[in-house]
Amino acid sequence: MYGEDSLADSIGLTGYSVDGDGIGGVLKSRIADFRVDEISTSVKIDPRGRFTVANITLTNWETNRFVGKLAKACGISRNRIFFAGTKDKRAVTKQIFVIDAPQKRVAKVEMTDVEIEILGRTHQKIGFGNHKGNRFTIVVRGCCDENGQPIGAKEALERIDTIKQSMEEKLGNGLFPNWIGPQRFGSGRPVTPIVGREVINNDWESAVMTYLTLEGDENEEVSNFRKHVRENGITQEGLDIIPHWLGFERDMMRHILEKPNDWVGAFRRLPNNLQLMTIHALQSVVFNKTIKARLDNDISLSTPIDGDIVGRVDDNGQLETSTMVAVESRTLERISRNCKLGRLAITGQLPGTSMMKPKGEFSEIEKSVIDSMELSQTSWRVEEIGRLTTKGTRRAMVTSFQDFQFEEVPIAGEETMGEKWKSGVKDGELWHPDGACIRFRFTLPSGSYATTLLREFMRVPLKQL
């Protein structure tokens, strides 16, 4: 077992599905080492359509910030740009965007590390999660053992195969725990669930100040800015020293300087999807802790028990939440068989105002997680911004990975590596520059996280993912 990880603790991402020795290593040593290709649902092209459809490749762009820049370049509101999901930042990502702007205007946009391929026009918007899945090609560099000593490719490949076989025996073929990955919470700065807690408590000043001041794994310029605001509040001086790329923080501060005490208005300066993400992030911590609690109680994630809530899994690997049912003793055998075949999945809680709840032993486990997080008295209603009120839902506790391949790749030259690699191994990290490099290829359904699958094989602190 690898060392304690405070980031993992804060988002509930602790423990593993099976025992075993990981391969260590680090992700994203080079931007090209992490590639995501979205498997899009078909968008019907119509020359008379209102919207422009484009396949856009981003290199080292955070999705929300790119959308803001694209909106400005097109002269439109960011709310007129539609996409199916946010992707990893330090990566090469390719996905569909639907843009409410003339095709010629979009075609003229030129941005660094952005390739825009115009596909045509459409009447059809796309929404969050409106894609089939993602294909990943990811290189893990610097493999090592639990003591930080380098391991070769043969040893690394054997460890991967051993863990994969153990997961198949425990969970089923091609299944892994459906943990919600660190990027949902703000990689390196898990601010969103903390802000989300303040939002559902209707404490808007704390929500804004937390977003502005919570420190994470950021550079010195950003840390100094956050420290200044934490110690001095929102001032013109703080606005003057804000790093230019922190556009959301700048907008929030300007709003308060112009309209003192309008904390709800300041929070609204965040993009709508990021506002909602704060609520989803808090729900996600609950879900991750629920997976861990079920594992700790030695209850299978893939074989149901009496009282569980199960739902149908469609052909794209998505849970159909509208038809979930409770497991009863008379249906247990049939449901177990369908879970084993991948047709049904056991679900865990994403709490809200009216979420369907299990019964029996798992009900007590879910309640204990809510109690431990001091959320038992929470209504999940957000009066000032009603669209942030959530009914709650449930999420499959395991998900599938397909087309899984892993192989050795050569160690890359030092000159091609990023700063994370060049700065060397830091205290608490588990990788070694002389260790083997392994390339993984696999496909995941929409809403599942590559980092949480690789975490099962690497077993490293989250800052290495």
Question: Language model features by range: what are they?
Answer:
Residues 67:
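Generic structural marker for isolated residues within well-ordered, non-membrane alpha-helices
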Residues 448-452:
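Pseudouridine synthase
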Residues 1-45, 51, 59-64, 73-441, ...:
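Extended, charged/glycine-rich binding lobes that contact polyanionic ligands
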